[in-house]
Amino acid sequence: MPSYLSFARFYDGLMQDACYEKRCDYILKLAESFGHDMGITLDLACGTGTLTRLLKKRGVDVFGIDYSMEMLSEAMQSASEEGLDILFLRQKMQSIDLYGTINTCVCTLDSINHLTKIEDVAKTFDRVGLFMDDDGLFIFDVNTVYKHKNVLADNTFVYENDSVFCVWQNTPEDDNKVKIDLDFF
């Protein structure tokens, strides 16, 4: 996944407004509303592991999977710096292979949208289901076609904070896809 080679070192700076604490709270409250015990939890497409670390700090038995070695390197370094013992694995979403079962899987920040073929989405759901306990819970989010057509569309966004300056340019493509070009300075 060459597109993530330089992206990993800027990712956390770019995602400062992602409200990870609120996402973590929401996930835990959602599970609670279903009377669900998080149990062993997979953070699928964990990126730099920010949510993974927050879940761990809240007492969740969590591990992370991502395909980008660069993202995983950032995740492992951050977990180590925070004194957290978290397993991170390099695997593709659509072909995860685990040694046991999970009770919960979370996949946030529109990571499912990075799968551009419906077959890969189906494979991902099948693989998660294969390793999920019978009473398991899969929590994920996606961008909608509406967002792709009306928000991202043919727009350019500029993000600037203390750690990154990014120009985000969207180009609509066929089949409700959007090509995204990111330039970092």
Q: Could you tell me what each predicted segment is?
A:
Residues 1-45:
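Conserved class I S-adenosyl-L-methionine
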Residues 108-110:
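Residues lining the SAM
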Residues 113-115:
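A short His-aromatic
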Residues 122-134:
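A short glycine-rich, Lys/Arg-flanked "PGG" loop and its adjoining helix->strand segment in the class I
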Residues 42, 49-95:
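Class I SAM-dependent methyltransferase SAM/SAH-binding core
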Residues 139-185:
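SAM-dependent methyltransferase
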Residues 97-104:
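A short acidic, Gly/Pro-enriched loop at the edge of an enzyme's catalytic core
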